[in-house]
């Protein structure tokens, strides 16, 4: 009957052989890959394509014309919110101020400004309305995406 020590030695030897075989296979594949004449060309092409891809993504993320339109929309929504609040229509004013929060680049800062400028009651109403406005915005965006995807 084999002892536990001999069984452990056998298991350790098998593990060492397996690790050695795996390492050898990795070295073999690396040499085969590096020996491929097209490898350096593909690597060079990939390295050249990375900065171009990054530039393309950067231009897609920041478009000055879109930024200007967002600023105009933001200012319009703030003005409409102030107008409705000055008329005593708190619900309409809060709706427009919430829309301004959606398109604002720094919504936390805008909330701080609203906290200091709006009456406490109106500010509380705005805070309670924010999740609903976000849900409505997401639903509108999903609907718009579905309409853009629909070929009809």
Curated annotation (Swiss-Prot):
Supply one GO molecular-function term: mitochondrion targeting sequence binding
- Where would you find the membrane-spanning parts of this chain? 10-29
Q: Where in the cell is it found?
A: Mitochondrion outer membrane
SS bond partners: none
- Main localization category: mitochondrion
Q: Where is this region: Disordered?
A: 43-62
Feature: compositional bias, Basic and acidic residues: 47-56
Topological domains, Cytoplasmic: 30-152
SUPFAM superfamilies listed in its UniProt record: Mitochondrial import receptor subunit Tom20
Question: Topological domains (Mitochondrial intermembrane): residue ranges?
Answer: 1-9
Look up and give the membrane topology term: Single-pass membrane protein
- Give the highest taxon in the source lineage: Eukaryota
* Recorded GO CC terms: mitochondrial outer membrane translocase complex
> What processes in GO biological process is this protein linked to?
intracellular protein transport; protein import into mitochondrial matrix; tRNA import into mitochondrion
**Any matching Pfam family:** MAS20
Q: Which UniProt keywords apply?
A: Membrane, Mitochondrion, Mitochondrion outer membrane, Transmembrane, Transmembrane helix
What family does the database annotate?
Belongs to the Tom20 family.
Q: What is this protein called?
A: TOMM20-like protein 1
What is the gene called? TOMM20L
């Amino acid at each position: 009957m084999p002892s536990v020590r001999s069984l452990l030695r056998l298991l350790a030897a098998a593990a060492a052989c397996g690790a050695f075989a795996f390492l050898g296979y990795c070295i073999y594949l690396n040499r085969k890959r590096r020996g491929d004449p097209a490898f350096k060309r593909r690597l060079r092409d990939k390295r050249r394509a990375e900065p171009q891809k990054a530039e393309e993504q950067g231009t897609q993320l920041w478009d000055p014309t879109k930024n200007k339109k967002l600023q105009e929309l933001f200012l319009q929504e703030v003005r409409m919110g102030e107008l409705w609040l000055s008329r005593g229509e708190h619900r309409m004013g809060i709706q427009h101020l919430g829309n301004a929060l959606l398109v604002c680049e720094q919504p936390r800062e805008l909330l701080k400004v609203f906290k200091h400028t709006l009456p406490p009651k109106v500010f509380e109403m705005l805070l309670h309305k924010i999740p609903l406005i976000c849900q409505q915005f997401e639903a509108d965006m999903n609907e718009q995406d579905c309409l853009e995807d629909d070929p009809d």
